[in-house]
Curated annotation (Swiss-Prot):
Residues 1-19 form the signal peptide. Keywords: Glycoprotein, Hydrolase, Lipid degradation, Lipid metabolism, Secreted, Signal. This is GDSL esterase/lipase At1g59030. Glycans are attached at residues 25, 316. Its main location: secreted. It is found in: Secreted. It comes from Arabidopsis thaliana. Belongs to the 'GDSL' lipolytic enzyme family. GO terms for cellular component: extracellular region. InterPro entries: GDSL (IPR001087), GDSL_lipolytic_enzyme (IPR050592), Lipase_GDSL_AS (IPR008265), SGNH_hydro_sf (IPR036514), SGNH_plant_lipase-like (IPR035669). The lineage of its organism: Eukaryota, Viridiplantae, Streptophyta, Embryophyta, Tracheophyta.
Length: 349
């Protein structure tokens, strides 16, 4: 009898442990992403914009070697995070005309390369503003309700991980068109306030687990070094990095306050320090080159300037932190995701 009781207890423990594991694996039904080229997996492909990359050598390290509209040699963080969450190896672009209803269930990215928190940024670049991405998100939820029911839509809204990634294009480009209205500090503050407003609006639509990326050290991307870093030294554009830091200094406490005010979880995700350390100490992370991109000569090549006619593209992109003159390589993205995701997800789930 004692043996039977012991066996029954062991079975119960096994079932409970297995259920807990199953629950943990199914906690996150989808990944929903908003933002710019860092997270764009092809939303710009059919837009009337010059900011496209659906041609070689973009995608040379993507599965099958296809150029999909991702601003990298391979996958981008939206893909890598989706994989790490156990959802899919790649995250589809919402604007993909071949997307089927079932493709929506594990999440999508609404991100559009070249956009920003400043509405002027998307207008200048002829891309999808973050505010229009919210409109697309409303449409997405309507589709989920129509095809899979109210309960599934509720599950996605309440339990999915929502990511917001923007600010680089505002800081690096649009500010130059806004100097008559803002100095550097006030513009960075305006962007941070816009980011908080965006998160508030996303929360109103039902999102409850939201992570917001900090600005990155955009003054250290190869293009900024080439144009503003000095002909011989090609150092980082420090005034631009200072603007990014000001944006972060404003954004972080504002999101903390919002997290206390609203139900759910709202996280500030510090990407700046990790990427800056990678750029300053590339060998520590297994990289050889940090001040040039792999594509072309790595100084100015981006979008159509990074093309298959350029004979200087490197053969080993994994040795480079940057793929083109503005965007990291897949391997650099992987390092960032591996360094940050578990740390921050533990605060959400």
């Amino acid at each position: 009898m004692k043996i039977q009781i012991l066996l029954f207890a062991l079975v119960l423990i096994f079932v409970e442990a297995n259920a807990a594991t199953q629950g943990k694996n199914t906690t996150i039904p989808a990944l929903i992403v908003f933002g710019d080229s860092i997270m764009d997996t092809g939303n710009n492909n059919n837009l009337p914009t010059l900011l496209k990359c659906n041609f070689p050598p973009y995608g040379k390290d993507y599965p099958g070697g296809f150029a999909t509209g991702r601003f990298s040699d391979g996958r981008v963080p939206s893909d890598l995070i989706a994989e790490k969450l156990g959802l899919a190896k790649t995250l589809p672009a919402y604007m993909n005309p071949y997307l089927k209803p079932e493709d929506l269930l594990k999440g999508v990215t609404f991100a559009s390369g070249g956009t920003g928190y400043d509405p002027l940024t998307a207008k200048i670049m002829s891309v999808i503003s973050v505010w229009d991405q919210l409109i697309n998100f409303k449409e997405y939820i309507s589709k989920i309700k129509r095809h899979f029911g109210e309960e599934k839509a509720k599950d996605i809204l309440e339990h999915s991980f929502f990511l917001v990634v923007s600010s680089s294009n505002d800081l690096a480009h649009t500010y130059l068109a806004q100097t008559h209205r803002y100095d550097r500090t006030s513009y960075a503050n305006f962007l941070a306030d816009s980011a908080v407003h965006f998160v508030r609006e996303l929360h109103k639509l039902g999102a409850r687990k939201i992570g917001v990326f900090s600005a990155v050290p955009v003054g250290c991307v190869p293009l900024q070094r080439t144009v503003f870093g000095g002909f011989f030294t090609r150092g980082c554009n420090q005034p631009l990095n200072n603007m990014a830091k000001q944006f972060n200094a404003r954004l972080s406490p504002a999101l903390d306050s919002l997290d206390k005010e609203l139900d759910g979880v709202i996280l500030y995700i510090n990407v700046y320090d990790t990427l800056f350390d990678m750029i300053q100490h590339p060998k520590k992370y297994g990289f050889e080159v940090a001040d040039r991109g792999c594509c072309g000569k790595g100084l100015l090549a981006i979008s159509y300037l990074c093309n298959s006619l350029n004979p200087f593209t490197c053969s080993n992109s994994s040795a480079y932190i940057f793929w083109d003159s503005y965007h990291p390589s897949e391997r650099a993205y992987q390092v960032i995701v591996d360094n940050l995701l578990d740390k921050y997800l533990s605060k959400v789930y």
